């Protein structure tokens, strides 16, 4: 009976509340109207489509990528689509100093920050891993470390607005995928870092949500070229994928699954993990870290 009161009943209450509110909360485009949003990796593909969706919703959009010419076109199109404002800052996320300075610059451009969408990646060709440590290091730096730098730099602004961090990841960060060892390692690391960070935020009363987006194969030009003749699967549309990512961030969901197969979300969603996180957290004295 004591075990039920201490563990089972709180767990049941958490899950019932979670599913009730998740089922009854609907996304509305006006949730993003006037919001200040950063999108990285926004010169093409999913990032560009997210910028366009946000523009249609009336958000203030700041985009970044390496190609200045491409970013100029994205900003121009965002303004045509109805963005409250649109700005770009070109640079590479291989440079951690740039990553940190970019967040500060973006905050100056739009007067703060409500949502940070981390979408950029280091491209890695599909091939058998053969002691390419340079490739692995670069993947970890761009796909993980720069995400940490960006989110850390953005946190003071996001605390002020009870904002959101949206992390674009992959099925390759949930299951073993051949020919993508370096990429997969960086995506598994994203899950580990940001899922742990979410738990810390919740326990220390930091009202900033973290949404991890688990994507399957999406029909971007880069992805289609990478898998041609190697991987046989139907790709999902990037436009719809981009919208689902934004919805998940706006609704402050823990995870978003987007793939052409319903099996992806059914098999990868793990309620047991949430239970274990809850039980584990009970063993920590988190009160000493609140407001520190």
Swiss-Prot record:
Q: Which residues are glycosylated?
A: 95, 207
A GO cellular component entry from the record: endoplasmic reticulum membrane
What keyword terms does UniProt attach to this protein?
Endoplasmic reticulum, Glycoprotein, Lipid metabolism, Membrane, NADP, Oxidoreductase, Signal-anchor, Steroid metabolism, Transmembrane, Transmembrane helix
Q: What membrane topology was assigned to this protein in its record?
A: Single-pass type II membrane protein
Write out the catalytic residues in the record: 183
According to its UniProt record, in which tissues is this protein expressed? Liver, kidney, lung, hypothalamus, anterior pituitary and placenta.
User: What are the recorded GO MF terms, alphabetically?
Assistant: 7-beta-hydroxysteroid dehydrogenase (NADP+) activity; cortisol dehydrogenase (NAD+) activity; steroid binding
* Quaternary structure and interacting proteins, as annotated: Homodimer.
UniProt protein name: 11-beta-hydroxysteroid dehydrogenase 1
Q: What is the lineage of its organism?
A: Eukaryota, Metazoa, Chordata, Craniata, Vertebrata
């Amino acid at each position: 009976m004591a075990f039920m009161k201490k563990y089972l009943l709180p767990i049941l209450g958490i899950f019932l509340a979670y599913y009730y509110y998740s089922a009854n909360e609907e996304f509305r485009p006006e949730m993003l109207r006037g919001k200040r949003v950063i999108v990285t990796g926004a010169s093409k593909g999913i990032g560009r489509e997210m910028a366009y969706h946000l523009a249609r919703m009336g958000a203030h959009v700041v985009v970044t990528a390496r190609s200045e010419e491409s970013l100029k076109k994205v900003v121009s199109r965002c303004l045509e689509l109805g963005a409250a404002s649109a700005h770009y800052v070109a640079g590479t996320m291989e440079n951690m100093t740039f990553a940190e300075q970019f967040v500060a610059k973006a905050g100056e451009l739009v007067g703060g920050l409500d949502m940070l969408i981390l979408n950029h990646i280091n491209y890695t060709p599909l091939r058998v891993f053969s002691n390419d440590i340079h490739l692995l290091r670069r993947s970890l730096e761009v796909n993980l470390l720069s995400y940490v730098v960006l989110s850390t730099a953005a946190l003071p602004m996001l605390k002020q607005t009870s904002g959101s961090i949206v992390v674009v990841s992959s099925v390759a960060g949930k299951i073993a995928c051949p020919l993508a060892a370096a990429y997969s390692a960086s995506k598994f690391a994203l899950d580990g870092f940001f899922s742990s960070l979410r738990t810390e935020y919740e326990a220390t009363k930091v009202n900033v949500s973290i949404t991890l987006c688990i994507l399957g194969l999406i029909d971007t030009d880069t992805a289609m070229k990478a898998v041609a003749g190697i991987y046989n699967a139907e790709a999902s549309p990037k436009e719809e994928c981009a919208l689902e990512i934004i919805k998940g961030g706006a609704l402050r969901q823990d995870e978003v699954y987007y793939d052409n197969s319903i099996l992806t979300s059914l098999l990868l969603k793990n309620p047991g993990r949430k239970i274990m996180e809850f039980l584990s957290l009970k063993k920590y004295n988190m009160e000493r870290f609140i407001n520190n």
